[in-house]
């Protein structure tokens, strides 16, 4: 059946070890490519080509998403995201004005030593104060001077560890896109492409750049199922069995758009 596919795909990732499911409906691209090893068998006078030896079939998947999702990075690491975890992160305060007693007060709550920067770029490090007020040496900054403070604070968030000894696990992957009837331009069927046994690539890049949205990309390599020998399955499922199928020309003739007639 001839149809038109013009969209990307929804993508489902299911971890084989525990069934954890990751889903995206914001994929920018969902592709797969096949490559095989081909070698010519030659013989006879002139060493002419007699046969092509085919082997080593490979299928590689690439999914690029519009949104960042920590689950994607977790897939490349073989690690589980820890929820509601206390972590220490850096914070800073700008424009802190030294008062007449040569003190400054921080709004945040440091959990580590505080480092102050003056207008000359010099630094002054001091232990955490219980009341948030810090006395600044007059040799470092005078009254009315502006300082910047850098320190660590405690937050609660989702934590993903990247360990040297852990690697990605096996997944099942399914693409789902839609196909259109070229005669009516209505949605005719759903196209499913299933990969029952894939391994995510450990390669992952996060490039943070001004003005450009981070579009994470993850790659997989399909492996053969040990029972069925299948690496992938493509399924076309009609949305409605009563939906009119695209009209196919079985006469071998072509219609003339200029004359409205038939040209043999």
UniProtKB/Swiss-Prot annotation:
Q: Where is this region: Disordered?
A: 237-264
Q: What is its main location?
A: virion
Which Cys pairs does UniProt list as disulfide-bonded? none
Single GO BP term = symbiont entry into host cell
Give start-end ranges for the coiled-coil region(s).
none
| Compartments where found | Virion
Keywords annotated in UniProt: Host-virus interaction, Viral genome ejection through host cell envelope, Viral penetration into host cytoplasm, Viral tail protein, Viral tail tube protein, Virion, Virus entry into host cell
Q: Which GO terms describe its cellular component?
A: virus tail, tube
Biased composition range(s): Polar residues: 250-264
**Annotated site residue numbers, Binding to the host DSR2:** 13, 23, 72-73, 173, 200, 218
Which intervals of the chain are annotated as region Interaction with Bacillus subtilis DSR2?
1-76
Subunit record text: Interacts (via N-terminus) as a monomer with Bacillus subtilis defense protein DSR2 (via C-terminus) in a 4:4 DSR2-Tube assembly; this interaction induces a conformation change of the tube protein and activates the NADase activity of DSR2 and leads to an abortive infection.
- Protein name, UniProt field: Tail tube protein
The scientific name of the source species is Bacillus phage SPR
């Amino acid at each position: 059946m001839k149809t038109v596919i013009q969209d990307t795909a929804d993508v489902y990732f299911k971890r084989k070890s525990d069934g954890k499911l990751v889903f995206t409906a914001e994929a920018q691209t969902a592709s797969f490519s096949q490559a095989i090893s081909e070698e010519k068998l030659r013989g006879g006078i002139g060493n002419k080509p007699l046969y092509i030896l085919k082997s080593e079939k490979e299928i590689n998947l690439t999914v690029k998403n519009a949104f960042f999702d920590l689950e994607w990075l977790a897939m490349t690491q073989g690690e589980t995201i820890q929820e509601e975890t206390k972590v220490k992160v850096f914070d800073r305060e700008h424009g802190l004005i030294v008062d007449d007693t040569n003190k400054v007060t921080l709004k945040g709550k440091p959990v580590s030593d505080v480092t102050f920067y003056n207008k000359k770029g010099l630094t002054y490090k001091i232990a955490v104060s219980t009341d948030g007020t810090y006395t600044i040496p007059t040799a470092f900054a005078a009254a009315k001077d502006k300082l910047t403070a850098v320190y660590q604070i405690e937050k609660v968030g989702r934590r993903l560890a990247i360990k040297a000894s852990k690697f990605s696990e096996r997944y099942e992957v399914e693409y789902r896109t839609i196909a259109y009837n070229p005669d009516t331009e209505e949605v005719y069927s759903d196209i499913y492409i299933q990969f029952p046994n894939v391994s995510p690539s450990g390669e992952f890049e996060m490039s943070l750049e001004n003005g450009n949205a981070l579009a994470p990309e993850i790659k997989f390599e399909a492996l053969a199922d040990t029972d069925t020998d299948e690496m992938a399955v493509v399924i076309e499922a009609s949305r409605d069995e009563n939906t009119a199928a695209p009209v196919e020309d079985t006469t071998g003739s072509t219609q003339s758009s200029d004359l409205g007639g038939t040209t043999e």
